[in-house]
Amino acid sequence: MLPRFRSFYGKLIIFILVALCFILYSKVQQNGSPEEPPVAPLVRAAALRGHGRERFEAYSDSENEIARPATQSPYEQIIQLDLQKQKVGLGEQGVAVHLSGAAKERGDEIYKKIALNEELSEQLTYNRSVGDHRNPLCAKQRFDSDSLPTASVVIIFFNEPYSVLLRTVHSTLSTCNEKALKEIILVDDGSDNVELGAKLDYYVRTRIPSGKVTILRLKNRLGLIRARLAGARIATGDVLIFLDAHCEGNIGWCEPLLQRIKESRTSVLVPIIDVIDANDFQYSTNGYKSFQVGGFQWNGHFDWINLPEREKQRQRRECKQEREICPAYSPTMAGGLFAIDRRYFWEVGSYDEQMDGWGGENLEMSFRIWQCGGTIETIPCSRVGHIFRDFHPYKFPNDRDTHGINTARMALVWMDEYINIFFLNRPDLKFHADIGDVTHRVMLRKKLRCKSFEWYLKNIYPEKFVPTKDVQGWGKVHAVNSNICLDDLLQNNEKPYNAGLYPCGKVLQKSQLFSFTNTNVLRNELSCATVQHSESPPYRVVMVPCMENDEFNEQWRYEHQHIIHSNTGMCLDHQGLKSLDDAQVAPCDPHSESQRWTIEH
């Protein structure tokens, strides 16, 4: 055959192949919309969740069945289908997205199982923008990228939705300074989700800049704490930045953290943590003018608190920048997102390696950092969005209360005599067999010459209410002629609720732990007693969040076994009431037995 004919037929074949590819692509894309994307056909991982990592099968739609080419990786085809499902522009700037039709049904069904709309997540691009929610003053900051310490970002995952994990990775790559971001270390804590195996390896190998992402796979599930230690051991950056596997960063969130550690290597830093809705993926904030810092509750749980006025005054005195963007001291940290000098992390004791699973490690590190000479600071110009779920979709090994057991270990080492208040709130942990030996952590405290928990409360968190100090009485508020006690009925203390009545427990329980303060406030740990404004009975006792200044909390008096509300002059009364009824006040009657109460201590 003459050369010109060979050339002609060659071009014709290429033209036909291109035309076929275009027709196939058009069929896949037709009828697509942000509300109801086309179902990706053809090659799929078998179930793609909960099966062996290497099992694949052919998938066919009503019209086509396409065999897997022998020369092409099956993961490439699957990843291409994943990318086809994504809708460019969907959810950009962090706006909410609402699915409809079959996609909504799929999303709702998945949400019931894992508390996250994975159907929607798969339609959002991995590198979507979430907007710039920083204080405008932050944009004026300048950092010398050549002199910033380098960062190793450590992300632990266990059966994290594939698309959510990759969005965390891509967000980190696109929002952190390229020179400063040395590496991202993904630690697989024993996942059995097929997508997180060889498919993830292939994606990282083919679509992430070489050397930027390392995947460390643990043979057995170790839990968050030990998995983080495994990641930290192989990190090579100057700074460790720990992130949860479901985060998206704001513009320039890394640099302020690295700059502050450059200035103060014993400062442990947390960004402002914004909320990404687990259902519609909306990125929301409380604005840039105010933010909260970390506190704790006496039952060992982390708590958010408003920035104390005392801290605002310290910022004005000590900070050279505008106060709104100054580092703010935080008594504790949530623990999911923070930055720490890598060498200091090991010097100050890293994590308690005998803690299992998850929970308690954040307060342990918080108290340890403060008591041993460091600081915990919130950096206002660093903002990261985090998906908060309604429930935890994964069980912990052996269904143990790892949070409670870990917190008890923490309390034994760091809380000194205040451990008694912890056990008042968690009596079930006082003699728990699984707490284990804490000798090596006590030795660490001695080695580091750390301060007392009394010092911590006095100097770092003086706003924290101590139920047994500066009080006229504390414990159960017990009716004299009945086995009935004042009780919070386990209600949500983040908003006002009606106090109630309940049979007195043999052992003091958290729900019946009240204090009558020296400033005449009747309260529990977080809420103060008031009386509902009403034109007629019943006059209910309402618990409202306490004000930092006791002058603004309503006053009560305790006289001759009567608990009297100062504003109304009425007395706490259980006449005609039974268990689970709302607590009430009534006009005082010195002869009424139902108005007589004792305070336990």
From Swiss-Prot:
GO molecular function, one term: carbohydrate binding
Topological region Lumenal: 29-601
One of the GO biological process terms: protein O-linked glycosylation
Keyword Transmembrane belongs to the record: yes
Pathway: Protein modification; protein glycosylation
Binding site for substrate: D189, R221, W358, R389, H392, Y394
EC number: 2.4.1.41
InterPro entries: GalNAc-T, Glyco_trans_2-like, Nucleotide-diphossugar_trans, Ricin_B-like_lectins, Ricin_B_lectin
Membrane-protein topology: Single-pass type II membrane protein
Segments of this protein annotated with the region Catalytic subdomain B: 327-389
Residue numbers spanned by region Catalytic subdomain A: 148-260
Localisation: Golgi apparatus membrane
Stored CDD domains: beta-trefoil_Ricin_Pgant1-like, pp-GalNAc-T
Disulfide-bonded cysteines: C138-C381, C372-C450, C485-C504, C528-C546, C571-C588
Catalytic reaction list: L-seryl-[protein] + UDP-N-acetyl-alpha-D-galactosamine = a 3-O-[N-acetyl-alpha-D-galactosaminyl]-L-seryl-[protein] + UDP + H(+); L-threonyl-[protein] + UDP-N-acetyl-alpha-D-galactosamine = a 3-O-[N-acetyl-alpha-D-galactosaminyl]-L-threonyl-[protein] + UDP + H(+)
Tissues in which the UniProt entry reports expression: Expressed in developing oocytes and egg chambers. No expression observed during embryonic stages 9-11. During embryonic stages 12-13, specific expression is observed in the developing tracheal branches and brain. During embryonic stages 14-17, expression is restricted to the dorsal longitudinal trachea. In third instar larvae imaginal wing disk, expressed in clusters of cells in the presumptive pleura and notum.
Domain Ricin B-type lectin: 472-600
Cofactor: Mn(2+)
Residues involved in Mn(2+) binding: D244, H246, H386
Keyword annotations of the record: Disulfide bond, Glycoprotein, Glycosyltransferase, Golgi apparatus, Lectin, Manganese, Membrane, Metal-binding, Signal-anchor, Transferase, Transmembrane, Transmembrane helix
Transmembrane segments: 8-28
Glycan attachment positions: N127
Topological domains, Cytoplasmic: 1-7
Record text about domains: There are two conserved domains in the glycosyltransferase region: the N-terminal domain (domain A, also called GT1 motif), which is probably involved in manganese coordination and substrate binding and the C-terminal domain (domain B, also called Gal/GalNAc-T motif), which is probably involved in catalytic reaction and UDP-Gal binding.
Function statement: Catalyzes the initial reaction in O-linked oligosaccharide biosynthesis, the transfer of an N-acetyl-D-galactosamine residue to a serine or threonine residue on the protein receptor. It can both act as a peptide transferase that transfers GalNAc onto unmodified peptide substrates, and as a glycopeptide transferase that requires the prior addition of a GalNAc on a peptide before adding additional GalNAc moieties. Prefers the monoglycosylated Muc5AC-3 as substrate.
Name of the protein in its database record: Polypeptide N-acetylgalactosaminyltransferase 1
Species this chain originates from: Drosophila melanogaster (Fruit fly)
Lineage start: Eukaryota, Metazoa, Ecdysozoa, Arthropoda, Hexapoda
